[in-house]
Amino acid sequence: WHAMEHNNSYGYLTDCQEVPITFPPQHQERQPGFEYVMEPKPVSECGKACRKLEGRTALITGGDSGIGRAVAYDFVKQGADVAIAYYDEDRDAEETAKRVQQLGGRCLLLRGDLKDTAFATYCVDKTLACFGKLDILVNNHAMQFIRRSILDISNEQLAFIFQNNVFSFFYLIKAALPHMKRGSCIINTTSVTAYQGNKDLIDYSATKGAIVALTRSLALSLVEKGIRVNAVAPGPIWTPARSP
């Protein structure tokens, strides 16, 4: 981020700039990828804890690796219990759960396909059964496939990427919302591609733009219920998602 100019009402205005980042070559034949095969290993630990989330329960999708894993570790250090929904990356998920336990937290692993509405409901139901409450929903999972032209994006891929990256967010929110009380929050992971675009990730960028619109609209819808809805838009991060 680059500080632009001082504003009396809002402090320093900022503008997102492209920063050259070079990642080591990486290719995995499947999505979602596996974090345990990455070299170097991503850094998932965070700084000091001040127990801001004591007594809270969070459901984090894609929490087996990457950004989701880092969020899980941070939340546990802040005092939360975590439920982690993931696809089939068992080794990564078990490593995350083991570290959560080492940090003194409790972790529930939920394996399945979030494109399935029944699994979204299952995740919420199991979280409630295990921890008795749901305070934080982190919709973090996503897939991306590099395509050099929009003509290379098949109709099947287009439907798949929207079902996985957008529709599943709706399924989880609809399943979780009846159980979330005032003071709860929903956090959606979008991307800088929603604002800047990406010529090789056209369909992925479109899903991230949809998540921005979902977040803003849902925030307006739930403000009177006292439920916050926010989005985080990361730039390039060294995760298994960067391996198609």
List the model feature ranges, each with a label.
Residues 173, 207, 215:
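Active-site helix of classical SDR
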Residues 18, 22-23, 116, 121, ...:
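Conserved mid-core segment of classical short-chain dehydrogenase/reductases
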Residues 151, 183, 196-202, 224-225:
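Active-site loop immediately N-terminal to the catalytic Tyr-X3-Lys motif
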Residues 51-83:
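Canonical Rossmann dinucleotide-binding motif of NAD(H)/NADP(H)-dependent dehydrogenases/reductases
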Residues 151-170, 187, 211:
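Catalytic Tyr-X3-Lys loop
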